[in-house]
């Protein structure tokens, strides 16, 4: 794990976390915020700069948190919002669509088109890696 690989809890973090990668900074900031006792969590691009394995772990933690607390998740990666109770799709600075993933997909609007395009890109990327 990150902690063990970097000297454990004795690791010294430089000013502005200059000795951490972008992904490490993101994970550390998220860990600090998720351990705080809050009623509402607002996570803006919580998995940006994160590898896919870490993203899956983070999203599982967010899903578990959402069972007990209010979570507002802002994400350009629509696969992360699929399990949300309510999805607000934004366009030109306003709410263009609102509903569950299933309802938004059934409507065939902008959310459905963007989700399908992202899914096709990700599947193509995975095939290229194999």
Model-derived features: where do they sit?
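Helical segment within the ABC ATPase nucleotide-binding domain
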Residues: 55-67
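Conserved "ABC signature" C-loop
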Residues: 1-14, 37, 53, 110-113
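Hydrophobic anchor residue at the start of the ABC signature
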Residues: 30, 74
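Conserved catalytic segment of ABC-fold P-loop ATPases
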Residues: 83-89, 110
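Catalytic Walker B motif of ABC-type/P-loop ATPase nucleotide-binding domains
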Residues: 41-45
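Conserved catalytic loops of ABC-family nucleotide-binding domains
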Residues: 64-73, 81
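Conserved switch/coupling elements of ABC/ABC-like ATPase nucleotide-binding domains
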Residues: 88, 92-96, 100-103
